[in-house]
């Protein structure tokens, strides 16, 4: 079902599986992946499982922070967005415990060191 403004706002209040489309940093072609977002204190974040190598989606956003945030649950919408990459340790330590709890993880230090983390700034 296409999203009304109220339905979109309601969908953004809770984390869920979405897709994002970034522009390939080398190819210039759109790259769409499935990922989960989190609403933490009214802000939208995307993270991932910790690992030392940076994900392609994050490298793409470092090259061009504009992307499309695709709601795809009960509400469908393609939302223009900009990524704010979060590298600063203190901010990561404030945000990632929420993600760790949602995923029932107990490796916060590894997440702070290795998990990708962006804040999603919707262009609305």
What does each of the following model-derived ranges do?
Residues 1-16:
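Extreme N-terminal tail/first-helix region
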Residues 4-7, 32-33, 105-106:
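A generic local structural motif
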Residues 15-50:
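Short beta-strand segments
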């Amino acid at each position: 079902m296409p999203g009304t403004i109220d339905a979109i706002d309601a969908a953004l209040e809770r984390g869920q599986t979405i897709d994002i489309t970034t522009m390939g940093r080398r190819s210039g072609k759109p790259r769409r992946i499935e990922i989960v977002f989190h609403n933490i204190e009214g802000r939208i974040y995307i993270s991932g499982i910790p690992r030392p190598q940076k994900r392609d989606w994050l490298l793409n956003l470092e090259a061009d922070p504009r992307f499309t945030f695709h709601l795809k649950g009960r509400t469908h919408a393609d939302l223009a967005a900009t990524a704010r990459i979060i590298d600063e340790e203190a901010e990561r330590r404030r945000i990632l415990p929420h993600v760790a709890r949602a995923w029932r993880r107990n490796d916060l230090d590894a997440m702070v060191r290795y998990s990708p983390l962006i804040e999603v700034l919707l262009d609305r």
